[in-house]
Amino acid sequence: MGASATNSVTHPAFTLNVRPDNIGIITIDVVGDKVNTLKAEFADQIATILQQAHALPKLQGLVIVSGKPDSFIAGADITMIAACRTAHDARVLAQKGQSILAQIAAFPVPVVAAIHGACLGGGLELALACHSRICSLDDKTVLGLPEVQLGLLPGSGGTQRLPRLVGVSKALDMILTGKQIRPRQALKMGLVDDVVPRDILLDVAIQRAKAGWLNRRALPWQERLLSGPLGKALLFRIVRKKTLAKTRGHYPAAERIIDVVRKGLDQGGPSGYEAEARAFGELAMSPQSAALRSLFFATTSLKKETGSAATARAIHRVGVLGGGLMGGGIANVTATRAGLPVRIKDINPQGINQALKYTWDALGKRVRSKRMRPTEQQRQMMLISGSTDYRGFERVDIVVEAVFEDLSLKQQMVADIERFGAAHTIFASNTSSLPISQIAALAQRPEQVIGLHYFSPVDKMPLVEVIPHEKTSEETIATTVALARKQGKTAIVVADRAGFYVNRILAPYINEAARCLLDGEPIESVDNALVDFGFPVGPMMLLDEVGIDVATKIMPILVEQLGPRFAAPPSFDVILKDGRKGRKNGRGFYLYSNPTKNSSPTKNGNSPAKRNSFKWRKNKVKPVDASIYTLLGVTPKAHLGAGVITQRCTMLMLNEAVRCLDESIIRNPRDGDIGAVFGIGFPPFLGGPFRYLDSLGADKVVQALRLLVQQYGERFEPCQRLVTMAEQQQQFYPVDANIDEVTDVAS
């Protein structure tokens, strides 16, 4: 790590140590924070420390490192934007960042970034301003510019430096997607100059600084071709077309990124930087960015909560009942993310093998991409074991049940765990439709029974619903939430009512889409209207993907407990009697050449929300199966209009979300927004149902619902909570609160 320093200047977040060999080490360590983030007040500190370094006559080079164990710089502190009241304020903020990083880029001796851990957003922009970048060959090291996911663009020079470093094509791909780049990939594309083991990272960076100025790496011929006039024009035309097709114009940051990158390439750096700062300022004030940032703060705050006032029990071992798709996924995230031993129980060895293969294949992908060593794959696989009986379950702290959606079977599972498990073992059911109170009805220890509703595919979807029943103990709630967090999940605690939260707000949306079809609207018109609105996939395509039989299974339960407004249109019975189950058997609303085995529901009983936005955007447009119109006695003709279709479907979802809040199904609007966005793909740029309701105004929503009542029936009757809010001109979120403050008052 080098000899002792001969000179030291200390600031709250930055320390400059100069070694006897005249290499300066700038260490970034934000006091009191687990990770480094760049804050507005650091600008002067960085400028001061650079001035101190510049004044050293014998200085040969600088190396910038992090004082955090597994984080370089996780990005800029986006609460800075909350302090900006105008686009001009945000523009000045960006210009300040540009100015500071320009000082690093213009420093008279080589500056090397030694990167270990997350190097994201403003962190990568700082690294790009350095003259060389060395990163650790470590799974914790990632590089990226994720600002687009917050409705922003990189505002401290990232849109200008990255294209010149790696080429415009690769740069646009990184900035437009916000994807994270792993070390080997970063080296291959020229984002970093070397990748080394973590324990020699600083030494290699010091040697690089001593080596003086190095020749700049030449871009690959493909990137050079795309930098020419013809190649550049073609590239930007294709990128813009694909971007608009994906965003449907709902994410202005993507289009501004394209404009700003093009500006810098065509007119030079000064024009590019000016355009970047201006675009950053305008985007920071956009409603889309406000909504996306609200989701960021909401999920961040939720991950800090325990779900209960009680203290969670320590979790040392986990059991899983059922080795199907859901059981295998749950075992996977428990072993690979939580790092906990998992014992799988299935009625036959094939189910256990299937669950083991799930994790083996997932880890195998990481090995093949050089993100994991084979020895680590073997180590993590050793955390998972299986049995056709309950041997080993006497030592587990919590059991997650993922078997058939059959009440008597689940009650038997509870009895088995109470017999073969420990006295403190928690029983968590992954049911999507059955009341937890009924599952616990025969339990000897009902206080240790709870619902834990995952969404498929488990290793991709961030959301879980934690469902306590009236006898569930506070300790059980806290422990279950703790497990979900260890698995990398965002957990919302919801009440034990039919459909819980996510499926309950999805059901009326699906039903109304089917009614639009019965009104004669073509299937593709219904789906396109909702995709244009911002959903990742249309409702009819969703039914095909989920399985029409699976999606409609919950409807009778909702009708029984919540009333006739949940009654499914008769078309579903007709479709099911015709043997149409969707993609899994090749017969649904759309035509399929080959049914996909992976799309079939498992014995774990996938729910409508279980198959969600992860793969939806990857689905190619398929032709509609026109025979379904004859089956339903419908002559398709587009006549409703996209606006009417969208209003009918979304207004029912919004109304039901407010009912869920009024009935305490969800604890606050924040949880409702997170559940809808991460559970069913509600348009993120709208912030979730409750933030969208605030943007529309309760009075306007009530007015729209009452008009729909006159046109289509009582199912559109606005709930009393919404009517009261309209009369009193109330909102779900405080009007005068900053976005980052909302999470503190959401309850």
Curated annotation (Swiss-Prot):
Region (Disordered): 590-614
GO molecular function: 3-hydroxybutyryl-CoA epimerase activity; enoyl-CoA hydratase activity; long-chain-3-hydroxyacyl-CoA dehydrogenase activity; NAD+ binding
GO biological process, one term: fatty acid beta-oxidation
Region named Enoyl-CoA hydratase: 8-197
Cellular component, GO annotation: cytoplasm
Similarity comment: family membership: In the N-terminal section; belongs to the enoyl-CoA hydratase/isomerase family.
Protein name: Fatty acid oxidation complex subunit alpha
